[in-house]
Amino acid sequence: MRLNKMTGRVIATMGIAAMMMTQTAGVMAAEQTENKQLKVVYYNQADYPGKKIGGSTIQAAGCGPTAVAVCYSSLTGKKADVPKMCKQAYKHGWYYTGQGCSHSVVPGLSKLYGMQCKGLGMDKDAVEKALRAGHPVVALMGPGDFTKNGHFVVLTRMVGKDKVKIADVGSRARTAETWSLKKVIRQGKEGANAGGPFWEISVKAGRTRL
């Protein structure tokens, strides 16, 4: 059977449209894969009045364990016992009275609670890649918007091309804000050890809440 020119053009147009729809769907699927969003469970240090970590209180010096607790509950869906995590930090020598938690508290507690921890140093690209994969990133912040000395927070997801959401375990107000990733990286604690000041936290495949 012979097709006239008009029919041929219609079929060709339909074919091109179908191809474009397929390509668009592929791009959308890729974007969704590259921008997984973590279901964040938030904890705040001030929610444990009077609870101790070493010779101090969780509210004053428990940001490290509380940040790891955010990662644990967000990734596994299980409730974290923040005071118990703080006791574990002290028991294992990751807390120094009068000084706060050591940088090793992040990989140490992560391993203790069955999570994987990867030190990212100050690598902005690695931090962004981790967040787009749905992995929280614990950050040890230096002097700036978050602290005058040192403070652990959790980067939870990318917003658009270069912004980030943060679970600040010491401030609900800062948690509600959206931050420049470049600015956050610049304010990372200089001289951090144990792979810091940024650590990617994850769990084995099949155990996440994504």
Predicted regions and their residues:
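Gram-positive cell-envelope targeting signals
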Residues: 1-30
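Active-site-adjacent structural segments surrounding the nucleophilic cysteine of cysteine proteases
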Residues: 9, 24-96, 178
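Solvent-exposed loop/turn segments at secondary-structure junctions
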Residues: 48, 70, 77, 91-96, ...
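Sec/Tat-exported extracytoplasmic proteins
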Residues: 67, 71-76, 89, 93, ...
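Mid-length scaffold segments of soluble, non-membrane domains
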Residues: 87-122
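Active-site-adjacent substructure of cysteine-protease-like catalytic cores
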Residues: 116-169
